[in-house]
Regions:
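N-terminal active-site segment of His-dependent metallophosphoesterases
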Residues: 1-94
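Extended active-site neighborhood of metal-dependent phosphoesterases/phosphodiesterases
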Residues: 2-17, 96-147
Length: 147
């Protein structure tokens, strides 16, 4: 029995998104957010030599800009293209968990792409992948690609 094209495509696709009828599909790209928690820095003098910033203010500012941008763009999909969390400042994983919960709160599909700082947390890549895969609106599936 021949294999139909839609069966082949279904085996290659992890996620399918529906566009809103009557308007073009909108994708918002957020890049280099670099969420940090100065309280977790392995080298506290590095961040404090630049500027003394409170953890709460960093999150508030960053999340304010993310929310404002999402509200203006009204996207159907959000791509977060690298350096979402500065791993060296997130050895507990708290910043990544906050970011994931915040992104899920918009109830819009979103997908992270790894940057060169995302994998620096001592929690490790496998743990980070698990967090993304558990998120309700995150379109992430761990594969066998490394870089």
């Amino acid at each position: 029995m021949p294999i139909r094209e839609d069966q082949v495509m279904a085996s290659l696709v992890d996620f399918v998104l529906q566009a809103c009828e009557g308007r073009e599909f909108r994708i918002l790209q957020l890049t280099d957010i670099q969420i940090i928690d100065p309280g977790q820095s392995r080298y506290p003098e590095r961040i404090n030599n630049i500027t003394p910033i409170s953890d709460e203010q960093l999150y508030a500012d960053c999340f304010h800009y993310i929310k404002s941008t999402i509200e203006k763009a009204k996207p159907d999909l959000i791509l977060m293209t690298g350096d979402n969390v500065y791993g060296e400042f997130d050895d507990s994983g708290a910043s990544l968990r906050k970011l994931i919960a915040y992104m899920d709160s918009f109830q819009i599909p979103w997908a992270p792409v790894w940057g060169n700082h995302d994998n620096e947390s001592t929690k490790g890549v496998a743990w980070q992948c698990e967090q993304f895969e558990k998120a309700q609106y995150c379109l992430f599936k761990r594969g066998n690609i490394t870089g």
